[in-house]
């Protein structure tokens, strides 16, 4: 989503600098292809983090960006610390980016606690979901200004593509008549692959394609296939009929569901994060951690006649085009930054971010 946002801002004449805390990271090459300047820090250990903070502070002083936008918990905290070390320049708005709703406190509780204590530092906190706002306020975040900006989906890339559909199905030995459900998610407890696979075992008439890092090691039923990490998700989605999300917690805005809808797939999702808002009454919304309910929703979508399922998929795409385009997301970020006091103009670097 960071890549999409930077692309949308560049299209509006705003040069971008992204600071990556993971070195090359998964997005660095894509950002550089767009023309974004990527600064790689990749801190290791306490000493490395201190050096990275100093480097980031020097970068802020040098670039004097209109906005220093954090991204995820680590990025938010690094942005806050470096902004302070740089003297908290008045002409650089500090903003945070929350990308999740409820989390596993055992894994992320320390980061959440630090964020809670520092949540008054940024001039703006942006969440990609109302569920994320509600969760963080309940956890004690007290930001000065909040904005909910849903993710933007590239509907040119994610679209119905008969040629891509036919090619991938031939590659995987799936007929054009087969009903195919796409699950795009890394292997992580929040994505709840166990519930998905339990539901899949109850629906032998549906073929399941699992795309995401870690999925190749899963024990799968006969009607499921793992594709591992893929950089061509647009092609994977185009080959499907149903976009399915089995997340148990932690989702803010589900890109996988929205991208599948943009590709013309009917959605089946658990009611986690803002999934209900994304679906907008389309497809099926089921409780999390309920394999029977998920299996029944999949049955309902799979037994639709093919023309009815295609029509439902086109309605899903129309919803994403109307409500969740990349251009709309970029405009919402610009409006939120300006409302929080950012002065965006001139010809120099405008924003910086932490990845």
Sequence positions of predicted segments:
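A conserved mid-protein helix/loop that constitutes part of the nucleotide-sugar donor-binding site
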Residues: 1-7, 179-202, 206, 215, ...
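Short hydrophobic beta-strand element within catalytic cores of glycosyltransferases
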Residues: 19-20, 266-269
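Short His-centered aromatic/hydrophobic patch
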Residues: 70-76, 98
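A conserved, positively charged/aromatic
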Residues: 94-126
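A short, active-site helix/loop in glycosyltransferases that binds the activated sugar's phosphate group
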Residues: 120-147, 153-157
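A short helix/loop element that forms part of the nucleotide-sugar donor recognition site in Leloir-type
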Residues: 159-174, 307, 313-317
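Acidic donor-binding loop of glycosyltransferase active sites
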Residues: 238-252, 265
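Conserved acidic donor-binding segment of nucleotide-sugar-dependent glycosyltransferases
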Residues: 281-292, 300-306
